[in-house]
């Protein structure tokens, strides 16, 4: 059976944490900030963690991490 290849787009979007989780970046951060409050913009700066329901599927895509 051939080796599973890393999904390159996913590898660029997710990073492995020290405890084995996957860190992700927030959506809605590229433009149109005038419609968002200061609090929304501040919270969008922080990275989030991948939810448990998505973890198994994403982990299979980013085999190299």
From Swiss-Prot:
Residues 1-20 are annotated as: Disordered. GO terms for cellular component: cytosolic large ribosomal subunit. Residues 1-16 have a biased composition (Basic residues). GO terms for molecular function: structural constituent of ribosome. Keywords: Ribonucleoprotein, Ribosomal protein. GO terms for biological process: translation. SUPFAM superfamilies: L35p-like (SSF143034). It holds the Pfam family Ribosomal_L35p. PANTHER family: 54S RIBOSOMAL PROTEIN BL35M (PTHR33343), LARGE RIBOSOMAL SUBUNIT PROTEIN BL35M (PTHR33343:SF1). Belongs to the bacterial ribosomal protein bL35 family. This is Large ribosomal subunit protein bL35.
């Amino acid at each position: 059976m051939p080796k599973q290849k890393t999904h390159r787009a996913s590898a660029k979007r997710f990073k492995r944490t020290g405890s084995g989780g996957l860190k992700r970046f927030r959506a809605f951060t590229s433009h149109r900030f005038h419609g968002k409050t200061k609090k929304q913009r501040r919270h969008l700066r922080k990275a989030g963690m991948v939810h448990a329901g998505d973890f198994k599927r994403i982990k299979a895509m980013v085999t190299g991490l």
